[in-house]
Amino acid sequence: RSAGADRFLMLTFGNAKVLDHLLNFCHHARRAGIVHVVGAVDVDAFTKLASHGEIATYKTPLAFERYTLDGGNSHSSSSWKRFAAMRTGEVARVVQLGYDVLHSDTDIIWLRDPTPYLMCAGAAARVGGEFGSESRFPCAPLRSADVAVSSDNMGPSRAVAGRAAYHASGTFNSGILLFRATPDGKRFVKAWHQNVAEPARGSRFARLTSDQQVFNNMVRKERQWPGVGGRRDSWLMHSIHPD
């Protein structure tokens, strides 16, 4: 299945050491009908994924460099930082090509296609549809977002009940990231990659060791810790559910 008129795709990355994760990810994504592409971090991963035929995969720049991710996978290791720089760069590159990209970690199991909700199109978005204006989770507010990120709160019902108090000021988890190919979406993802790969010397990003840390620092005031200083009232939920 191609990205089609929606120009939307899911993108994930992995090497041969997490091949079981990659195959499991692709199995569920394919069963759910999600347009997805796997960026192979090494040649071995590409060869094994390509041998399955139905998996859309390609060699990332690191695969051409015969790169290997060290066993520790510490965020402070040089090999991890190279991986993070490549990953953010590839996401940015696809967004710049005009595609809305949902970046997903490989250890996530997708049971349903998120496209109808994220793109807010088709029958699901119409009045009376699953994500229509009268739905508990209408898709229209998210459609206007240039960037969206998951949090460590895994329950949408809990989020609604709590009026998004944690989401508004908690830690943002880069395990699921949505970047739209809008002018602001393109600018943000380009800056995200820049701040991960080549942070300005002496900047707040220079000392950070992961793309998640960089993302959180980009959307918060300097020295504002997650959960401290953020608005904790129900302003976010009221904007989505004015009733």
Describe these PLM feature segments.
Residues 1-17, 70-79:
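Glycine-rich phosphate-binding "P-loop"
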Residues 28-35:
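Short, acidic, metal-binding catalytic loop of nucleotide-sugar glycosyltransferases
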Residues 36-41:
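Short internal beta-strands
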Residues 59, 83-159, 169-171, 176-181, ...:
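GT-A fold catalytic core of metal-dependent nucleotide-sugar glycosyltransferases
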Residues 169-243:
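Catalytic core and acceptor-binding pocket of nucleotide-sugar-dependent glycosyltransferases
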